[in-house]
Amino acid sequence: MDIRQLRYFITIAQEQKITSAAKKLHMAQPPLSRQLKQLEDELGVVLFDRNKKKQMTLTYEGAVFLKRAKEILHRFEDAVIEVQELKEEVAGTLAVGSTIYCAALMLEKVTQIKERYPHLTFNIWENEPATLLELLESRQIDAAVTTTLIKSDTVQFKQLDDIPCVLVLSDEAGYPCGDTIKMVDIPSFPLILLRPVNGKGVYNQVMNEFHRLNLEPRIVCECHDSATLLSLVSSGFGASILPVTMIPVHMRNHVHTVHIENNPFIMTPAVMWRTDSYLPKPAQQFLDLF
């Protein structure tokens, strides 16, 4: 048994079909079938139920072996990375993610680390907190910046400074507004609100606060995409209530941010990372920036 056979087995378990696994592994189907048979013969157990026509499902023994095979493969990959990183130069790939509200904060750090280590490549995700946690635990990303803390035995958090939300307007829209605004005055503006798929986040906070104050907001658009929302705001389509960290650096000269008096919209971001495996040097350098 070797690492290559473990990779084959894990891929078959993920794809649930020999043909799909062979295609993903860039090899022919017969050699892959032989490798699986050799592995089963060596272990003395059947790893897959082959009686089902559409897909191969793991037997009980196969499910137990899959868990251990993944652990072994991850440890092997960690060892390879750690040895390779004994070189002084920081290189490789930095895989990180963030929620839509922390995107600008994350990208600011990514830009800093890119300037410091020009040989790095990047894999960047934007998603919901629960999905980011899954990506961390499945080792698809090394770190994430989020506004919602989800408990996990394999992930550690570092809370960052509070982030206030602000009213964001286009400089060219001509809305009469100073540097501060009261909540009771916000309904006079056409609002574009970001509404995540799961319905949580700033959207719920804003709607609950308007309801508490018996105010009727003038909502002209509910947007499910952060890039589209920012484009609409900068074009003068309407105003929005957003965390300041969500506004990209290149846009800050083209929009006007207005502080909300007695601000009820405060977010506490955190950076999170895995604790049950080796943390690649690029990820360590990324976390050091927070």
Curated annotation (Swiss-Prot):
The keyword Transcription applies. One of its GO terms (molecular function) is DNA-binding transcription factor activity. PANTHER family: HTH-TYPE TRANSCRIPTIONAL REGULATOR BSDA (PTHR30419:SF28), HTH-TYPE TRANSCRIPTIONAL REGULATOR YBHD (PTHR30419). It holds the Pfam family HTH_1. Could be a positive regulator of bsdBCD expression in response to salicylic acid. It comes from Bacillus subtilis (strain 168). GO terms for biological process: regulation of DNA-templated transcription. One of its GO terms (cellular component) is cytosol. This is HTH-type transcriptional regulator BsdA. Keywords: Activator, DNA-binding, Transcription, Transcription regulation.
